[in-house]
């Protein structure tokens, strides 16, 4: 029994790191301004960076820090941005089509003309976010998120307050 246990432990130790862990080389690529569709950017620090037109579509950006970054015209389509920090970031013309922004914090972020078609916003904090010219937003999406009186939305849409 002990021999089998040690054999299993040896096999597990020989396997590469978890597929869910960060990929430092892919994170470094994006930090240098290179597109990286489908990359594993889990917990990446992209704060304060200027990354216009970057393509991280389908990437795993869960728990990433994009605070105060400028990512105008970036492609986040189908990316996982759940539990990410987007505080004060600029995303003019960016695509978040079918992206997962569940429980993301986007307080004070600017989303001028950004596309939110089919995006998941469950539990997202959009307090003070500027989304007045955002496209593809629906009331159903916003009903699952929260904001405050300073959240700017397209005409006819509203958002429940954060608690």
Describe each PLM feature range.
Residues 6-16:
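Bacterial N-terminal signal peptides
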């Amino acid at each position: 029994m002990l021999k089998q246990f040690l054999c299993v432990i040896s096999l597990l130790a020989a396997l590469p790191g978890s597929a869910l862990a960060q990929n430092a080389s892919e994170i470094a690529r994006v930090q240098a301004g290179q597109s990286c569709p489908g990359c594993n950017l889990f917990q990446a620090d992209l704060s304060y960076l200027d990354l216009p037109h970057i393509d991280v579509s389908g990437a795993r950006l869960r728990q990433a820090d994009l605070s105060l970054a400028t990512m105008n015209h970036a492609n986040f389509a189908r990316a996982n941005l759940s539990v990410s920090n987007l505080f004060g970031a600029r995303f003019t013309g960016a695509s978040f089509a079918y992206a997962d922004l569940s429980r993301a914090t986007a307080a004070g972020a600017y989303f001028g003309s950004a596309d939110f078609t089919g995006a998941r916003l469950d539990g997202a904090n959009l307090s003070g976010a500027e989304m007045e010219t955002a496209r593809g937003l629906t009331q159903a999406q916003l009903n699952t998120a929260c904001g405050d009186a300073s959240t700017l939305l397209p005409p006819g849409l509203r958002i429940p307050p954060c608690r």
